[in-house]
Design a protein with these regions (language model features):
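Amphipathic alpha-helical interface segments
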Residues: 1-149, 172-234
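Histidine-centered, metal-coordinating catalytic motifs and their short helical/loop contexts
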Residues: 143-169
Length: 234
């Protein structure tokens, strides 16, 4: 089951890890942004510079995480990315096990549309499913919206983060990054049910998103404590 172990490594150590990093960064940054007035208030401790530094690091973390998910496969440096996972499934389908959880695999394919032929292929077995799922998912990755967002993402990574070139940072919006990560979550959800019998997506919700929000909840509590303590000192 070398192919299964390799696929699981790409998904667990690559995609799942980077999805978590992006979501964690996004939620922490959201809390910092929504509490900027309090964090910059001199009377409450003047923590603006501290959290400004956190912001810069978290933004880089988020960009790099999503960029890794959408990296191009490399024979020299095997990347844990969506396209490598798709190629592995396609090229080594005979080495993968039969679909472990057909019912939930079909439910997790809802993002493709109820009438998708991919959903019906699950009941036909592993070979038929992979033969239809891989092209369908590649079609998503090759869509104009995704291609445009990925190009913008890699521009920021290569020109501004990796090399610090004197170029205008035409980066993707947070909504675009969230959309890119949502595609990755959908992929992980399908493969998790199909080949690992592992729950990543249930009833349309990505299970680990709640864990990714825990640091931001802690930050909200910290901001509230700063606010209360500051009021008491006045």
């Amino acid at each position: 089951m070398a192919a299964l172990n390799e696929l699981k490594d790409i998904v667990v150590e690559g995609l799942v890890s980077d999805i978590f990093k992006m979501e964690r960064a996004y939620h922490i940054l959201s809390v910092i942004g929504s509490n900027a007035d309090q964090l910059n208030d001199r009377a409450l401790g003047n923590f603006g510079e501290l959290f400004g530094a956190f912001q810069g690091s978290l933004e880089v973390d988020a960009v790099l995480a999503v960029a890794r998910v959408y990296d191009s496969p490399s024979k020299q440096y095997p990347t844990r990315c969506l396209r490598r996972a798709l190629s592995l499934m396609e090229d080594r389908v005979a080495e993968l096990p039969e679909i472990a959880e057909r019912y939930n695999t079909k439910l997790s394919l809802a993002f493709l549309g109820e009438n998708s032929s991919v959903v019906g292929s699950v009941d036909l077995g592993r070979d038929a499913f992979v033969a239809r799922f891989v092209p369908a998912f590649r079609e998503i990755l090759d869509s104009e919206a995704v291609s445009k967002a990925v190009d913008s993402l890699k521009y920021v990574r290569d020109k501004r983060i990796a090399h610090n070139e004197a170029a205008e940072p035409h980066g993707p919006t947070w909504e675009a990054l969230k959309s890119l990560i949502n595609h990755a979550q959908n992929f992980v959800g399908v493969v998790g049910w199909a080949f690992f019998n592992t729950v990543y997506v249930h009833d349309g919700a990505y299970f680990l998103s709640d864990d990714a929000q825990r640091p931001s909840r802690a930050l909200r509590r910290l901001v509230e404590r700063i606010r209360v303590t500051g009021r008491g000192d006045r």
